[in-house]
Amino acid sequence: MEETLNNRIKTKIRRGKIYPLGFSRQDEWMQFTAIFPGQQEVKLQLWEKGEKITEIKLNGAYQIGDLYSVQIPATKKKVYYTYEVGGKQIADPCAKKLFTWRDTEKKVLLSTEIDEFDWEQEKRPELLFKEMIIYRLHIRGFTKHSASNVKHKGTFAGLCEKIPYLKELGINTILLMPCYEFEDYYMIPAADPRFSKKKGTIVKNYWGYGGACWYFAPKQCFSANKKSPETEFRSMIKEMHKNNIEVLMEFSFNSNINPYFIIDCFRYWAEEYHIDGFYINDGVTMIDMIAKDPVLADRKLLARYWDQTRIFGKKERFDLDDSKNALENQNDQRCLADYHDRFLKTARCFLKGDGGQTREFASVFRENSEHVAQINYITDNNGFTLADLVSYNEKHNEENGEDGYDGTKENYSWNCGQEGKTKKRMVLRLRERQMKNAMVMLFFSQGVPMLYAGDEFGNSQNGNNNAYCQDNKIGWVSWDQKARNEVFFEFVKKLIVIRKQMAVFQNAHRLYGQDYLACGSPDISWHGIKAWYPDFTAESRLLGVLLSGRYARGKDNRSIYIVFNMNWEDASIGFPRPDRGQCWKLLMDTAKTEAFVQERQNKEEKKEYYMKARSIAVFVSATTIDTMDRTSNLSYKHDKEQKAASKEIAEQPRKK
């Protein structure tokens, strides 16, 4: 049909298709398709050089339910468009690319097509969950600090400059906080009684969890190339994949969002940007539909909780034959992972010496599943950093201007005797030990470990546990801390090396505490003051964990014995008898000045180990004729990638 669109232009328009959403080209036509729930008047507006030239009312002929779609003849000119919904001008929720200009002080968002991109011979790493070391970061905050030593600070390109650092640390997966387009500022409602200083005021949306979002477009201000952020984003993905690093994206959807919209969104990012997986925030309904989407079958999907009964038809339980099959079949075909804070809360409480936590910690330590992986983390953006976790009892969010109402009150933290910054050596030494203890808990548990950016060298937010609006040194990773905490950084690197090397940490199934191989020992066992007799009473803060190498399937199948003393007093813990012809050799003790020890004395004759207060010791099995070199090399041996990355960093010129 032919319609008069305004007083100046006549053109042919026709009803569009219901798919794809957003702007697309259909042969010689341009299609505009969007979803706007509710009975509202919807108009499509076309713009040229900041001036509105065309307006099309979409209600009626171009409407199917809440979906609106129209096609107009294609043009070689750049097409800018917006929608007017209920009298309010908004950008296409499915826009693939956004621009801005100011018109009478009002921000108008416009969208168009994305540029072509040459992926060359790029190949996704396709890591198994059991192999993953996840690193959660904020694109801008990760490299924005002046000491980050990158040229393109706070951008996708800047993150690429940190690839050698990620490889040196041992990271093979990064989880990006929201980096799609979102409003940079939003207003706190004046009627909200929780806020006294910011009633009706505008705050910085640094994290991207509030305000309007455009889930199909990379965030323009996170790109050094403002004209083509999608090209810079894809270049970043290509470089990550070239270095065998997977990229996962976090999405924060409204609770009432249509699950089909989420599927379309994830399919788009998987196809156009080669994203390896997605983390879906809380509150999304019918999430199981996403897990069953065939297009996303080879992508990793993280969510707070997956209903295994609905997805797989049964709950996991102990079965002798199933356990043997899971042990022998270590391909790890899992694509789903639970992402919740159970490990965080339990590990923090156990770390600071709360009573009644030993049994619960033993449970989260071994938590794993044949069908759904478990993401373990002890810190993330929603709470204290690792350094602040051992430095503050209370949150200090004064800079947020909300009179302390914001941020969680349950931090499960302990300041080690002094609130905040201090020069007391005893306090500082205890804090460092507690940080080491936390990292051992994280990397030696059975789930998939996730490290929060900067924790590996003691990054601090000065006690702020909710830096959602702190686009400054409070919310950024402070790279100047790395030089001051080099010893702790090296400690974390060694833990990651051990995690990757030893097969007992790379199980793709649950450990049941059963001897289903009839080999004389269960896959995992618990111990106390006396071997084989764990104390799970409320007063106990002592626990030994034996991971049997007989159930491991890998190049290094040695057993590991980890002993935790989270009490404020020294204690002795029993030794389980090693396998015939083997002995226990001390690998590390967080109470020692040099945590990774070069001890040549074995523990073959000893029945117990004396532990300092608030410390963790790790023992590795070795044959009685083994030299100590093999054991000590376990903690100091770095793979080729890490060595090459360290050399590359050392040779880099310092950038301003």
Where are these predicted regions, by residue range?
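Conserved, mostly hydrophobic/aromatic
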Residues: 34, 83, 137, 166, ...
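Carboxylate/His-rich catalytic cores and anion/metal-binding grooves
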Residues: 167-203, 383, 391-395
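Aromatic- and acidic-residue-enriched carbohydrate-binding clefts of CAZyme catalytic domains
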Residues: 148-155, 186-242, 246, 253-272, ...
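C-terminal beta-strand-rich structural cap/linker in extracellular carbohydrate-active enzymes
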Residues: 36, 77-80, 600-639, 643, ...
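C-terminal accessory region downstream of the catalytic core in glycan-modifying enzymes
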Residues: 495, 568-601
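Conserved alpha/beta catalytic core and glycan-binding cleft of carbohydrate-active enzymes
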Residues: 103-109, 274, 287-458, 466-470, ...
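The feature marks proteins involved in alpha-glucan
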Residues: 1-29, 53-57, 62-138, 143-150, ...
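Carbohydrate-binding surface patches
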Residues: 30-33, 37-40, 526-576
